């Protein structure tokens, strides 16, 4: 029987090639796609097909996970902010002239970047207005495909200020569109996407030997993993062998991150562009699905160790402004790097099940991301600094300077890529809170208030709510809201990640102790579940420290880094021309910032650090600003008079125990990094 099914699949796979001869998606082509897809036999959700490595976690269909609480508020602010109106705010690029809508305007990455975030936002919120903004981009991309499989803009135009329209053939922006179409299929099951990608990937297999990834630009070489993961995604749907051949070819032509790590490039500055690193670092693990040599995972892990040591910043990012630029806490970290590294971590945890990647993902999402975008989601910083004491228009010690606008909150301040690309961060984070598991269970891998609808057990739909104020509270409550079968109960395993920072978690089921679990593990509760059953997960949050540049110390509690609370004076400024937008905000403070923490016993942090929690603020929909921060930590500190402003930023960092402090001890207040704009998050340590 298995041999017969295999033969049928092979025959149908061969027949699918004839789709490429169709002018477009005819009824005959649709029948062939239907036949091929119907042969896929899986559990509740599709895992990797042989010979690809089976994944321990599987992404759920787009729209299965809905945000609640503060996360829902974040996405609504995003919808009402820039994400929902880029065509109005940035019409020169996102308007009707865009090449990805058939116009003669910008035809490179920026338009696809926006849709790569807008599409998941639209379907997660189930918002018809946003879906209507997305659909013309989908339709034009699908209809643009040529007979040979190529798609997208294909005519170059003379340069025009503010537009990128002279490299229409480049492989790179098409990789972003492939991500968009994957998500669109996940939300809609539009079978045109399958035929479209099949045709394009045959074109790539035929064309890449003559016009490799680096033929038009180097960007595609560094970011080929986004192309590669789309190839594997399609292979899991159709099983066509040529896709595996293309997978090997894309890997061979891509930049070798393994060689980069082996050369020690990440131990030196300026060896790679910061966003290329954020996007491309997942390539070895994406390819590991096809070539299961452990060296691919080991290289990525070693790469992250090098990044942490030589470029690392406490909010989960690294000094990269735009080249990798060391770990001084006044070096910038680009917003594109944050959202792209989040996506890379989401994919790497799915493939490996390694919860180090999930811990890292939360560190970025709960610290770096909310700090770099304004509360109304209308402006952003191109770069952020861990020690950021002035947000002004001024040239700083960055690898790239854009007329001093890189720290300013604005629309096109710095470089426009981040204004176009920032939209994917929170929607994709929401989409990857939950995963399906091969044992027909469900896994809560990253935590935030949400609700998931998924099939478990013997393909039984369930609805599970997650109620929490995490990451600013330690308790997470899961409730089985619905079991959609006749008996209203179903047996399935419930997987729960326990972060490494948690010494020991407690899990209770319906009020009774179920188990305790050490940090850094996945707990599994496997039982018969029925409506209104509850799981309570307790993740005790203790204060601890981490050590950074010049032996500086950061204060952490749970997944959050804490930073000096400073008065923030926001002032709107007008630009004389529109190159960087029409306006920007500068943020300044009259508060002192040059504190060193008074030396303390790291083993007695619960006594040294005084934690206060405002339970009323834990009821607010939006915790991510200074006013609403529900958790504060008090620490003893002394001023360091020699630590002064340099170049409108914190001057050279005093080495811990070498700086001379002045005056008596003072009590300073720390709040979550993600609630700050001005801050010190890496403190020198001084004597008592």
Q: For each of these PLM feature ranges, what is it?
A:
Residues 23-40, 300, 358-367, 372-488, ...:
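C-terminal beta-rich recognition modules with glycine/proline-rich loops and embedded aromatic residues
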Residues 1-23:
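Bacterial Sec-dependent N-terminal signal peptides
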Residues 70-100, 133-150, 195-212, 245-263, ...:
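Long, well-ordered core segments of solenoidal/helical folds
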Residues 87-105, 152-170, 216-234, 262-283, ...:
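Carbohydrate-binding/catalytic loop surfaces
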Residues 22-110, 131-155, 191:
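Low-complexity, Ser/Thr/Pro/Gly-enriched N-terminal "stalk/linker" regions
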């Amino acid at each position: 029987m298995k041999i017969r099914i295999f033969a049928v699949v092979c025959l149908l796979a061969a027949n699918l090639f004839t789709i490429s001869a169709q002018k477009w998606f005819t009824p005959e082509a649709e029948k062939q796609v239907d036949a091929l897809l119907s042969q896929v036999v899986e559990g509740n959700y599709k895992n990797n097909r042989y010979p690809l490595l089976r994944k321990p976690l599987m992404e759920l269909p787009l729209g299965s996970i809905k945000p609640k609480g503060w996360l829902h508020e974040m996405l609504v602010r995003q919808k009402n902010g820039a994400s929902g109106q880029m065509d109005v705010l940035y019409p020169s690029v996102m308007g009707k002239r865009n090449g990805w809508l058939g116009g003669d305007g910008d035809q490179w990455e920026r338009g696809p970047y926006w849709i790569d975030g807008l599409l998941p936002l639209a379907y997660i919120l189930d918002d018809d207005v946003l879906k209507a903004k997305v659909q013309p981009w989908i339709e034009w991309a699908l209809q643009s495909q040529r007979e040979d499989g190529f798609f997208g803009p294909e005519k170059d135009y003379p340069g025009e200020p503010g537009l990128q329209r002279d490299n229409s053939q480049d492989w790179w922006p098409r990789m972003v569109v492939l991500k968009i179409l994957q998500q669109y299929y996940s939300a809609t099951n539009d079978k045109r996407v399958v035929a479209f990608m099949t045709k394009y990937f045959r074109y790539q297999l035929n064309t890449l030997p003559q016009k490799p990834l680096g033929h038009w630009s180097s960007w595609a070489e560094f970011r080929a993993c986004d192309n590669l993961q789309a190839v594997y995604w399609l292979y899991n749907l159709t099983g066509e062998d040529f896709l595996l051949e293309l997978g090997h070819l894309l890997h061979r032509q891509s930049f070798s991150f393994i060689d980069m790590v082996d050369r020690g490039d990440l131990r030196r500055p300026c060896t790679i562009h910061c966003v290329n690193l954020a996007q491309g670092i997942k390539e070895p693990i994406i390819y590991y699905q096809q070539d299961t040599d452990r060296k691919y995972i080991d290289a990525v892990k070693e790469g992250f160790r090098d990044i942490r040591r030589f470029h690392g910043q406490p909010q989960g990012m690294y000094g990269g402004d735009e080249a990798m630029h060391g770990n001084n806490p006044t070096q910038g970290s680009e917003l594109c790097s944050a959202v792209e590294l989040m996506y890379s971590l989401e994919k790497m945890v799915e493939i490996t099940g390694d919860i180090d990647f999930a811990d890292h993902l939360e560190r970025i999402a709960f610290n770096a991301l909310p700090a770099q975008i304004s509360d109304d989601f209308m402006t952003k910083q191109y770069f952020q600094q861990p020690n950021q004491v002035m947000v002004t228009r001024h040239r700083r010690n960055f690898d790239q300077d854009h007329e001093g606008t890189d720290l300013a909150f604005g629309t096109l301040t710095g470089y426009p890529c981040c204004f176009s690309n920032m939209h994917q961060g929170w929607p994709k984070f929401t989409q990857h809170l939950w995963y399906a598991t091969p044992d027909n269970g469900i896994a809560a891998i990253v935590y935030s208030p949400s609700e998931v609808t998924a099939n478990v057990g013997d393909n039984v739909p369930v609805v599970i709510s997650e109620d929490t104020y995490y990451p600013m509270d330690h308790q997470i409550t899961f409730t089985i809201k619905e079991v959609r079968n006749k008996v209203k109960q179903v047996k399935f395993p419930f997987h729960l990640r326990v972060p490494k920072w948690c010494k020991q978690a407690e899990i209770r089921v319906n009020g009774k102790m179920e188990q305790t679990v050490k940090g850094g593990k996945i707990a599994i509760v496997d039982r018969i579940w029925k409506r209104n059953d509850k799981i309570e997960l307790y993740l005790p949050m203790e204060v601890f420290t981490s050590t950074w540049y010049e032996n500086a110390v950061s204060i952490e509690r749970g997944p959050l880094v804490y930073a000096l609370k400073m008065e923030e004076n926001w002032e709107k400024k007008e630009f004389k021309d529109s190159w960087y937008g029409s306006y920007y905000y500068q943020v300044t403070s009259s508060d002192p910032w040059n504190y060193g923490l008074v030396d303390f016993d790291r083993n007695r942090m619960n006594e040294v650090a005084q934690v206060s929690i405002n339970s009323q603020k834990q009821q607010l929909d939006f915790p991510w600003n200074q006013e609403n921060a529900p958790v504060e930590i008090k620490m003893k500190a002394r001023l360091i008079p020699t630590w002064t402003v340099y170049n409108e930023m914190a001057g050279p960092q005093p080495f811990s125990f070498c700086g001379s402090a002045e005056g008596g001890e003072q009590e300073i207040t720390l709040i979550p990094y993600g609630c700050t704009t001005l801050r010190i998050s890496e403190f020198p340590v001084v004597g008592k």
